[in-house]
């Protein structure tokens, strides 16, 4: 949802609006600060202003682009959120420790299924695909032993 009244951020918004008016938009912006100051809201509002079809100093909130931004459904908006980290896992620990027992069991089962697969995976330089029906026609030097 676009919030046009982010409290305490008038100077920041005026700077971003002047950047938009002057067509001097950079390729990336970093919104940084303590929790609760409106970084996410300011970033979404600025993105909405840049994509607005009738921009002034604020997004018009009436065009189709602004309507999509209101519901966070615009194709140019990508919200990236980090996954929470498990505190018990250290960088020096083996990679399998990071997997839950259920995930590890599923991985073992998939590896068993792959082991029973009768087809041999061929890796040839500069070869993108080899139809399965033609694998018996390859030269013996190219077959994996």
Residue locations for each model-derived region?
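Clamp-loader machinery-focused feature within the broader ASCE/P-loop NTPase space
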Residues: 2-137
